[in-house]
Design a protein with these regions (language model features):
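Active-site-adjacent loops and short helices of periplasmic peptidoglycan-processing enzymes
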Residues: 24-179, 189-190
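Bacterial N-terminal signal peptides
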Residues: 8-17
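Hydrophobic alpha-helical segments, especially transmembrane helices
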Residues: 4-5, 24, 70, 247
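Bacterial N-terminal signal peptides that target proteins for export
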Residues: 1-9
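Bacterial Sec-dependent signal peptides at the C-terminal "C-region" and cleavage site
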Residues: 16-26
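Domain-terminus/edge residues, biased toward the C-terminal soluble/receptor-binding domains
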Residues: 155-162, 166-258
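A generic structural signal for well-ordered coil/turn residues at beta-strand boundaries
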Residues: 10, 38, 87, 214-215, ...
């Protein structure tokens, strides 16, 4: 269901890429009355300009599940590009990270895994334990890292977002909006293109082949031009996705929540 809904949004937006002359015209954004999606909230934006092409309840605060990890990835890639951490660093696993529920790669306390492999686990399998382990490695602790997440959200103008954890598990006050998700998604896609290399991998493995990873974003197999980004599902959030796609030079970001 989620795949069909989001594909509909992207197909609608990508119609502009089908005709070369279309990009020279003024695009009139759709409204709820002309184009509606059976979801709680959604937004479609042009990745390059940030222009909003469609929105529905885009400023309504909602849980966003593992789409939270977009911010975790954003801060991690920033730290890598600043030289504070490196892809071949060994990231230790704490008791706290070990106890994360939901999607995981079954990390053990005291286990070490390269940052590169942790990023694969986050981007491909949406592993909560890996997300928290990386958050602790970058920030020193998850609470400190979450403060960094909220500071970054404020700096990006994400005024309706507040994070309580680094992985997106349901928590009181852990909320964002379709618009804010689009903002942070655009930030990581434009400024940290390495994220696409991780998020577009369909299958990989860890621990010498013992742990198999299959991407949670099934649109990689069903929609031509998908470049990312992150799915998410929890009891409170429902099914969510922030998806990016490119065709004929037109790059779009679609966010569907609930």
């Amino acid at each position: 269901m989620m795949k069909k809904l989001l594909a509909g949004v992207l197909c609608w937006g990508l119609l502009f890429a089908a005709a070369p002359a279309a990009r020279a015209l003024t695009v009139e954004p759709a409204t709820d009355r002309t184009f509606d999606l059976p979801c709680q909230a959604a937004i479609l934006i042009d990745e390059d300009s940030g222009t909003v092409l469609y929105e529905k309840n885009a400023d309504e605060q909602r849980p966003v599940a593992s789409i939270t990890k977009v911010m975790t990835l954003l801060l991690t890639f920033e730290a890598m590009e600043e030289g504070r951490i490196h892809a071949d660093d060994l990231v230790p696993v704490s008791e706290h990270a070990y106890h994360m529920g939901g999607s995981q790669i079954w990390l053990e306390p005291g286990e070490q895994m390269t940052l590169d492999d942790m990023l694969k686990a986050i981007c491909i399998a949406s592993a909560n334990d890996a997300a928290v382990a990386v958050a602790e490695y970058v920030g020193g602790s998850e609470p400190v890292f979450v403060s960094m997440m909220n500071e970054k959200a404020a700096a990006l103008g994400m005024t309706n977002t507040h994070f309580e954890n680094a992985c997106g598990l349901d928590a009181e006050g852990h909320l964002s909006t379709a618009r804010d998700v689009a903002v942070m998604s655009r930030e990581v896609l434009l400024n940290h293109p390495l994220v696409k290399e991780y998020c577009t991998v369909w299958q990989d493995s860890l621990r010498g082949g013992e742990t198999q990873l299959v991407n949670t974003n099934k649109m990689l197999k069903s929609y031509t031009g998908i470049t990312g980004l992150k799915t998410g599902t929890t009891g409170k959030a429902g099914v969510c996705i922030s998806a990016s796609a490119e065709r004929d030079g037109l790059r779009l970001i679609a966010v569907v929540l609930g």
